[in-house]
């Protein structure tokens, strides 16, 4: 049998990946599955299927695609073959997500339709990148927060994103994830490359300054598509978060996306990342 996948949102990239996510309705645990037998044989990426997608879905799925591109770029499994794909996806998302979000199908414009088409392509490109390079703790955190509090995946991704970038983009004595091709810790350098590629920082700017510029531009992007990037602003009860903190931290640590993250997190660091999102 052949599997033919036709995406109807511009986010997950599932049409070209070996991944699936399941949620246990009883325990509220969300967990990814990975097996190359899950990869479709054919992907039909037709933007006609997303021209009437609601704005909210456009914003959340678009930020999910951005995270796929960012995490695959800084992953310990990234390579010369995946990084260009990640970069093109990042470029398309920065340039088109806001226009795609504000597009009104009731009053169609060529610019809006093109933006939705570009976002659809970007999501699949990001899927191609992370199908080979995998993801990181932005997704680990979002899986567990989303499952526990019932937040849409892309929203949980957006909330965790700036904290994960700051956590990864450090220098000095860093506990890096061991991987044969990842011999020196370079996450800050990788994020800085993205920032310079997008024109957010110049070649004379330090890597630290370039990363700060990238985080600032991502904040502008989430603001432009009306995403509140705090747990408190999305109805999460702090007492509930604190009560489940130990359990959530363990689940994040064990998530299938954690091993490819460039910085290997300790349980106490994961707890702080969870609290910082509030």
Regions found by a protein language model. Name each.
Residues 1-80, 171, 186-197:
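A glycine/threonine-rich phosphate-anchoring loop and its flanking beta-alpha core
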Residues 63-71, 87-98, 120-124, 138, ...:
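Predominant activation on well-ordered alpha-helical scaffold segments within soluble catalytic domains
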Residues 55-125, 129:
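C-terminal and late-domain segments of enzyme folds
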Residues 155-243:
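Gly/Pro-rich interdomain helix-loop hinge
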Residues 77-85, 102-118, 133-138, 176, ...:
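Flexible, glycine/charged-enriched surface loops at secondary-structure junctions
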Residues 11, 124-157, 254-260:
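Glycine-rich phosphate/pyrophosphate-binding beta-alpha loops
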Residues 238-278:
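Short, amphipathic C-terminal "tail helix"
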